[in-house]
């Protein structure tokens, strides 16, 4: 009832877009899709998901939200027209940011210190973005060197339309990922980064609706609190 009430207050319409920055198990996303399906019983999975995005910091919440969406959309899924469920493991308060050179950058706080990663904006918007990052993870797990990985994905990057400057930026990110792997951190960072870049690149939504958690500042991890303090002040919160 909370999702219904919240979206009624917003006067959300099926033609509107929606982002839930702390989506949990996806209740508000499901409500938006339910309303779209009610308005158009012949809608495809792609049209039902268009402009709908969820973000959460909890991996289990993201998994639950994706599972809920998959079940709810099952009558509309078509193997000939696959869709990606738009729920991302990311921090809505501290997203990947677009710089002056049209690259998205993000700093991961790891136990071996902060690591900055960047990818070109045009890469994130391409349908093959997640596939390329999945390939990088597979090659990292196979103990490929950074140079060998870059060589293996060169054709993929060129197919996306990246120029030599863009490819160099991706190469630096691959090198940082390999460095983490060499220090005992596995390639799961590829999956985490892909989601955080995709979340940062979510286009502006007509509506933001959700039920965010309430956490005392003093209960946040010290390093995390320090990293977002300046950003929060800039937002006026």
For each feature predicted by the language model, list its residue ranges.
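SAM-dependent methyltransferase catalytic region
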Residues: 1-237
